[in-house]
Amino acid sequence: MEARVAEAAARLARQENEIKSLTAEIEHLKNFGCLGISPSLEGLRDENAKLKYRLNFLQKSLQEEQSKTVKSMININSRLQEIFGAAIQAAYPELENPPLVVTPSQQPKFGDYQCNSAMGITQILLKTKEQKVSPREIAEKITKHIPANECIEKVEIAGPGFINVHLRKDFVSKQLSSLLVNGVQPPAIGKRKKVILDFSSPNIAKEMHVGHLRSTIIGESMCRLFEFAGYDVLRLNHLGDWGTQFGMLIAHLQDRFPDYLTVSPPIGDLQAFYKESKRRFDTEEEFKKRAYQCVVLLQSKDPDFIKAWELICDVSRKEFQKIYNCLDVTLTERGESFYQDMMKDIVKEFEDKGFVQVDDGRKIVFVPGFSVPLTIMKSDGGYTYDTSDLAALRHRLLEEKGDILIYVVDSGQSVHLQTVFAAGQMIGWYDPKVTRITHAAFGVVLGEDKKKFKTRSGDTVRLMDLLEEGLKRAMDKLKDKERDKVLTPEELKAAQMSVAFGCIKYADLSHNRLNDYVFSFDKMLDDRGNTAAYLLYAFTRIRAIARLANIDEGMLRKAAREEVIVLDHEKEWKLGKCILRFPEILQKILDDLLLHTLCDYLYELATTFTEFYDNCYCVEKDRQSGQIMKVNTWRLLLCEATATIMAKGFDILGIKPVERM
């Protein structure tokens, strides 16, 4: 290992020197260009652009080398892009930002990966140079310039100009051994950035319903992914804990529990309490007037009314926490009330910069590209959701100094959020080239009738009812399989919770979040197909293989350091490559925030493992006696590597596997 680190350090030093040299040359060219008298100025500008491209490429290589010294798992796709990027640059140095397309091959006959850049380069040469060159000829030229590397066994040119890449078996074997010795390491991300995720966000005094399920599950999983990748993550729960509805709630509290300041009111069912207060607000004029007075006193921070507000919030908070505990979700509460004192400054800042118009007493802000303005102050002087969302955005950017902001909110809020983001950019709070702000939108949950998921009476489904139903059905499923006869009561309880909550989460996460999805307990608890039930059962079977061979974790760790993982059988080779695709899967999700890609990968990994296990004996037994005759340790190591990746995948998805099911 020390020799490899020394070699990497030497390569880093050489690259740093070249980068310094190139930087100096670029500065020289800049200065020369500024004279404005050179007849070959255009040529110098072209050369400058090429040098910048080369500089960027070297800096990326430098980052890759640095990542290798800290044991991050190699992203094979990125490594191949680096290699082919160097080959294309060497073959066609005159091209600026040539296309770089490397993907896993879909069929074994096309190798392990494919580089399909030749077609794009053909078009560029025809368009910019008026050169007609066949993609195959370009592919041949690229392959001749592939630098010496540790991972490519051979390349072949197929069809019109596809470059089929075959990986070296010793390279794949070493990466698998490294995975087992060092554990699952995150992909290299360079500079550590701060990520702020806004998710879940229920309303105080209302119960969480099935509509909150998606935001909560998706947001939690995104947080886990960014945390694993090494980002500084702030998980925010933007609670609806302020507004006019608190006036009627406080007025009703005063009537029902007049001594609430000294005796904690026994509000058992906050939903019923809310409905009672709403009915009175709609039907009793005197109560309605008192409710408005309560709002004014609350907003003026009257201590008695703040106490009433806190009591109501606490009841809700405890109910929310029961659900968060079930789903293993962690959040930092920062509701609308947190931003109330910032509203005045938001209005003033937009006024000072000349963005505010007055319309029927309202203060509004038009944002270029959006037809509906933001209302930042109502005609009665009150603030709006627009004001509070702008205040939250400003605080996250300027006070929290977030580099990446992600709002996990339903698709129906898309136009509103995009308008708020654009307003923040317009006023100068952030530059989208520097700060990434994304609305991670999602569709609605449908019932099996393909309509919005409701109870038989037409009410919204309470989230706690849904989770309890999941627990009941999971236990029924386990008892149908007679697991209650082989598991201890503690193991059975753990399996029940793993299956129930794992299946509910996976059913959501395995669908593209942009689409609506049909909620079906029968489908999600099916142990066939791409479900959590199938993956959890597969995981327990994999973990049992070494245990049944009397091989413990210590023995496997020792074997990982000493034994070579043989990949001669086609199913061993297929499984080994599939395991090592994990870093590129994670990188893709960090880019597009589509978590179903991870679910698809885990299902592919489980089915690839099944193919391997059906064709390659890990433990060979005597057919008559059942006595173990031979243990193929390298295959047990492949089992362990598969389970290790699956466990990390489950962790990112928020699913808790069990050793026995």
Swiss-Prot record:
Catalysed reaction, written as an equation: tRNA(Arg) + L-arginine + ATP = L-arginyl-tRNA(Arg) + AMP + diphosphate
Binding site for L-arginine: 201-203, 212, 385, 389, 413
Main location: cytoplasm
Residue positions of motif 'HIGH' region: 202-213
Could be involved in the assembly of the multisynthetase complex as annotated region, ranges: 1-72
Keywords: Aminoacyl-tRNA synthetase, ATP-binding, Cytoplasm, Ligase, Nucleotide-binding, Protein biosynthesis
GO biological process: arginyl-tRNA aminoacylation
Alphabetical list of PROSITE patterns matching this protein: AA_TRNA_LIGASE_I (PS00178)
PANTHER family: ARGININE--TRNA LIGASE, CYTOPLASMIC, ARGINYL-TRNA SYNTHETASE
Assembly and oligomerization: Monomer; also part of a multisubunit complex that groups tRNA ligases for Arg, Asp, Glu, Gln, Ile, Leu, Lys, Met and Pro.
Designated name of the protein: Arginine--tRNA ligase, cytoplasmic
Organism: Gallus gallus (Chicken)
